[in-house]
Amino acid sequence: GVLMNPPYSAKWSASSGFMADPRFSPFGKLAPQSKADFAFLLHGYYHLKQDNGVMAIVLPHGVLFRGNAEGTIRKALLEEGAIDTVIGLPANIFFNTSIPTTVIILKKNRTNRDVYFIDASKEFDKGKNQNIMTDTHIEKILEAYKSREEIDKFAHLASYEEIVENDYNLNIPRYVDTFEEEEVEPLTDIVSKINKTNKAIESQTASLLEMLGQLHGTTPEADAE
């Protein structure tokens, strides 16, 4: 297997000669000069064992949804069934960057083209300078990864058809809905709270005026007016 954590969105030559390179040629386009992310990914993927190779690469989220050349490469990888799992990690867990990152797991010779999405962006404890993923957080991700089951607000197995419907865009919120419904307070409760507040303000105002009146009658300054 291959594990990679390359420099994010680094520059590279993207020289047209690379289109003849077997690492890149099957995917129709080269990674853009300003973002070598897919060049690293394809380099690692090329070196996987043909029968059962597995690779995990850490990259910025942009690789999941950016268009143009990167969109073409992503589509080719998805058509091939190469992308097995996409895991969204919390922001600020690495020393060298605070941006949220994603782990993409690729496999050679898969028999299907579905993609398992895990949104682990909230799986961390707050540390002094950065966020920390504990063994418990990592275990939760691994359990989900092994099961490939639907987990509310955490994981979703997207069929290839669903990915095509989303134009090969792998942005995690398209597949894992983490929206928390805010509890809606009944209007009658809101009105009664407002009434109570108004009454409290009225009574406080009355008390204040009364105190001012007492002051007015007792201070020497008031008498001198």
Identify the residue ranges that each predicted region occupies.
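A conserved structural/catalytic subdomain of Rossmann-like adenosyl-cofactor enzymes
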Residues: 1-225
